[in-house]
């Protein structure tokens, strides 16, 4: 899709740090936005900002942990902005902790929000896009989904699922007028795990240097404009390491260990546990850090 002006888009996770930057990038291209998230106040703040810039933006409140709200999201978004040309699946949650510390309910919530909900929303958006002969679905995954990450096992697993989902959907759509792309950022400055890390006073090794959220937002535009299969957004070239991981897994493990990444994530999980509030909804346990919600 070369010209996005006048295109209608649904952006999930719009209220989060990265979501706000994606919204601004799309709005700057003239895209009409349905901004989705769980909480009205930050979404309304973003809508006011975008409207002051001359953009068209409406709100669609939805909790992606609720199957009913997820299934109804496309219909509600199209009622606000019209038939959708673009879907950007950006919402997600993460929590740094030892895998054995998670409860079954916590795993189920993370799987539903991070993996099942994007698949369901895309399934509801796809028929209309195909019928109209125009559309693109962008899903924000993570480098964790490409390489695995200690002390964030559940998150990395759901993000790996998004990579597989997008690749499979793209293969099915080959030759169709609808594209599918997956964006895999590393640490994103001022957002998510990186932001919490800074709050906790934990310093990441240089190998995990963060990228600016504006760069990730530009990757979303690039994926749509050029129908990219996938884009890795990292401070360092990652494809060589991923190739080594496939060809020589043990060597890749030694390389990652040498960066200090494993020790860093262990420390982050420990600090998150120590600073956990007494009641962290939506997690049912009171002794764990709540997930970082990017809806």
Segment roles from a protein language model:
Residues 31-45:
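Conserved glycine-rich Rossmann-like NAD(P)H-binding loop of the short-chain dehydrogenase/reductase
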Residues 61-72, 104:
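The beta1-alpha1 cofactor-binding region of Rossmann-like NAD(H)/NADP(H)-dependent oxidoreductases
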Residues 171-236:
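SDR active-site lid
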């Amino acid at each position: 899709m070369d010209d996005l002006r006048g295109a209608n888009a649904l952006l999930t996770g719009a209220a989060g740090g990265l979501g706000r930057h994606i919204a601004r990038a799309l709005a700057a291209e003239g895209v009409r936005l349905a901004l989705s998230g769980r909480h009205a106040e930050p979404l309304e703040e973003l809508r006011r900002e975008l409207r002051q810039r001359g953009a068209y933006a409406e709100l669609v409140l939805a909790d992606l942990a609720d199957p009913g709200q997820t299934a109804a999201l496309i219909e509600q978004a199209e009622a606000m902005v019209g038939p959708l040309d673009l879907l950007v699946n950006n919402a997600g949650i993460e929590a740094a902790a030892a895998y054995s510390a998670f409860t079954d309910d916590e795993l189920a919530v993370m799987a539903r929000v991070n993996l099942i909900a994007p698949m369901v929303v895309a399934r509801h958006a796809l028929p209309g896009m195909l019928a109209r002969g125009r559309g693109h679905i962008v899903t924000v995954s993570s480098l964790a989904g490409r390489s695995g990450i200690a002390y964030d096992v559940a998150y990395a697993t759901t993000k790996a699922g998004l990579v597989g989902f997008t690749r499979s959907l793209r293969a099915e759509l080959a030759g169709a007028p609808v594209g599918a792309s997956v964006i895999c950022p590393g640490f994103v400055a001022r957002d998510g795990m990186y932001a919490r890390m800074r709050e906790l006073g934990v310093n990441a090794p240089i190998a995990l240097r963060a990228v600016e959220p504006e760069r990730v937002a530009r990757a979303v535009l690039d994926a749509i404009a050029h129908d990219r299969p996938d884009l890795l957004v990292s401070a360092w070239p990652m494809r060589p390491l991923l190739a080594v991981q496939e060809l020589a897994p043990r060597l890749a493990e030694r390389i990652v260990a040498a960066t200090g990444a494993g020790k860093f994530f262990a420390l982050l999980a420990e600090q998150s546990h120590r600073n956990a509030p007494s009641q962290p909804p939506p997690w049912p346990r009171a002794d764990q850090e709540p997930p970082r919600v990017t809806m």
